A protein has these predicted regions:
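C-terminal peripheral helix-coil segments that are non-catalytic and often amphipathic
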Residues: 162, 166-196
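DNA major-groove recognition helix of helix-turn-helix
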Residues: 51, 62, 157
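Amphipathic alpha-helical packing segments from all-alpha helical-bundle domains
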Residues: 118-151
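Short, well-structured alpha-helical segments
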Residues: 87, 146-154, 158, 182
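Alpha-helical DNA-contacting segments of helix-turn-helix folds
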Residues: 55-65
Length: 196
């Protein structure tokens, strides 16, 4: 059974990698799922079995992205506040250069493809909404009360990600961006800790 799971994971990765390479080279709207399948050496049906929509091919880590804040809150230590858990998560991601932050080489090309595609912009907004909803569910047991807490916490996370994206797209040095964003994150989470 482990071999089968490994083969499925390898096929999924091959399809996602082929899709991203084509999208970065030609743009999202100029690539078909059939071309992705051909590049990944699978059938179109196989591509759709792994990725039900073309947008799923581009945002292949969407479930991880949607659940990251909620998982940090759910999995935190008993003494750690929800704000502390999200702060720790973001700073750990920043320290290790997590690919979803966009500090890696080529990140500006990824975000240019999103900017050029209304469909991808809409999907990015949907993913942000779903992440906020997942966080609200996770916070329900931790903080109770109004949904604004999840909106504020998710909003800070989105703002920090946007700062990274905008600075990298403007050609800033990734290490300088990392330092700037760390200072902003520390200040933002300090302020948020007073709300919880």
């Amino acid at each position: 059974m482990a071999l089968r799971a490994e083969k499925k994971a390898a096929t999924r990765t091959a399809i996602a990698d082929a899709a991203l390479a084509l999208f970065l080279a030609r743009g999202f709207d100029r690539v078909t799922v059939a071309e992705v399948a051909e590049a990944a050496r699978v059938s179109v049906n196989t591509a759709f079995n792994y990725f039900p929509t073309k947008e799923d091919l581009f945002f292949d880590r969407q479930e991880q992205v949607v659940q990251r804040l909620a998982a940090a809150v759910r999995d935190r230590a008993p003494h750690e506040s929800p704000v502390g858990a999200v702060r720790r998560l973001f700073l750990e991601e920043l320290d290790r250069g997590d690919p979803t932050l966009g500090l890696s080489p080529g990140a500006e090309a990824f975000w240019q493809v999103v900017e050029d595609s209304p469909a991808l912009q809409a999907r990015a907004r949907l993913l942000a909404q779903l992440a906020e909803e997942a966080l609200a569910d996770a916070l329900g047991g931790a903080l109770g009360g109004p949904r604004w807490r999840a909106a504020v916490l998710a909003g800070v996370d989105r703002a920090l990600h946007a700062q990274i994206r905008d600075r990298i797209r403007a050609g800033a040095d990734p290490e300088a961006v990392r330092a700037e964003v760390r200072a902003e994150a520390e200040a933002a989470y300090d302020a948020l800790s007073k709300l919880a």
